[in-house]
Amino acid sequence: MTPVLPARRLLLVHAHPDDESINNGATMAKYAAEGAQVTLVTCTLGEEGEIIPPALAHLAADRDDALGPHRIGELAVAMKALGVSDHRFLGGPGRYRDSGMMGAPQNDRPECFWRAEVDDAAAHLAEVVREVRPQVLVTYDPHGGYGHPDHIQAHRVAMRAAELAAEPAYRRDLGDPHQIAKIYWNCVPRSELEEGFARLRAQGDGAPFPRIASAGDVPGVVDDARVTATVDGAGYAEAKAEAMRAHATQIAVDGPFFALSNDLGQPLSAMEHYLLVRGQAVAASGSDRGREDDLFAGVSV
């Protein structure tokens, strides 16, 4: 018997544990609370991540190489904070290893995500698409937001999986083809980011982090005019912050600000922004910028 699916279904594809909470935590919490099916697919365990707490430094790839399993636990706690129950790792936990930063020796490991054949990796995701049948997909832009090989590869795999899942002749054993109605890429409007940096600078000596990031340190920054959708997740700001705190090896959260292992402070925002690249935009009523305020706007449910 075919299970009855929720009316609204959102799929997010991310490279590493923590990417989902930083980029889309408020969006995920909002739609999950409203009864939508929210499915997260994470492509690697993030084994090559830099570790913030000194007490956990032994987990690093060049020591115990145990960061990946630890981050599985962090992600589970984050998903609970966001109210999301459907989370999967692409091809199963550990199928693809974190590739490290672009140009690192880890890029050459045969098991790393960067080295995966796109169609092979996309096959795992197409299976998920055929199963959960999302109307909306969220992932990165072609540059992966900031050029990390796993983010670039996640973009390629997500876009290819959307094509494969919609192809009637592809893997009939996976069920009927499914066309995703709307595809969005994550982005951050430059003006909002600069306003957040200004709030950080205004803290003066009381700033929670010793240094402040710049726009060049933040993935996916775009000119405001390019943003096509903004999800107001203000009611879920604490859920997002709690999810980010769960990723303690990677993120330090202090009030409305956070820093990664580079210790550069940046604003923690529950206003999350997107660029629609497939589908029809339906601007919110009264929007003076012509942006959508709902990723499902115009979608038949």
Swiss-Prot record:
Q: Which GO terms describe its biological process?
A: mycothiol biosynthetic process
Q: How is the cofactor bound?
A: Binds 1 zinc ion per subunit.
The answer, when asked if Metal-binding is one of the entry's keywords, is yes
Q: What Enzyme Commission number(s) appear in the record?
A: 3.5.1.103
Co-factor requirement: Zn(2+)
Its function, per the record, reads: Catalyzes the deacetylation of 1D-myo-inositol 2-acetamido-2-deoxy-alpha-D-glucopyranoside (GlcNAc-Ins) in the mycothiol biosynthesis pathway.
- Which family, according to the similarity comment? Belongs to the MshB deacetylase family.
* PANTHER family reported for this sequence: 1D-MYO-INOSITOL 2-ACETAMIDO-2-DEOXY-ALPHA-D-GLUCOPYRANOSIDE DEACETYLASE, N-ACETYLGLUCOSAMINYL-PHOSPHATIDYLINOSITOL DE-N-ACETYLASE-RELATED
Question: Can you name this protein?
Answer: 1D-myo-inositol 2-acetamido-2-deoxy-alpha-D-glucopyranoside deacetylase
User: What species does this protein belong to?
Assistant: Streptomyces bingchenggensis (strain BCW-1)
Q: What is the lineage of its organism?
A: Bacteria, Bacillati, Actinomycetota, Actinomycetes, Kitasatosporales
